[in-house]
């Protein structure tokens, strides 16, 4: 394979894994530990 193809595949995999981790952090198990500043603030 050419170098450009390998670099493109590597960057694509990196982007997909970062997106998957961000979705897991936002909606998965760790999301229970996130705080909501709007819920903490009382008017």
Swiss-Prot record:
Pfam families: PsbN (PF02468). The chain crosses the membrane at residues 7-27. Keywords: Chloroplast, Membrane, Plastid, Thylakoid, Transmembrane, Transmembrane helix. InterPro entries: PSII_PsbN (IPR003398). Its main location: plastid. One of its GO terms (cellular component) is chloroplast thylakoid membrane. PANTHER family: PROTEIN PSBN. May play a role in photosystem I and II biogenesis. This is Protein PsbN. It comes from Huperzia lucidula. The gene is psbN.
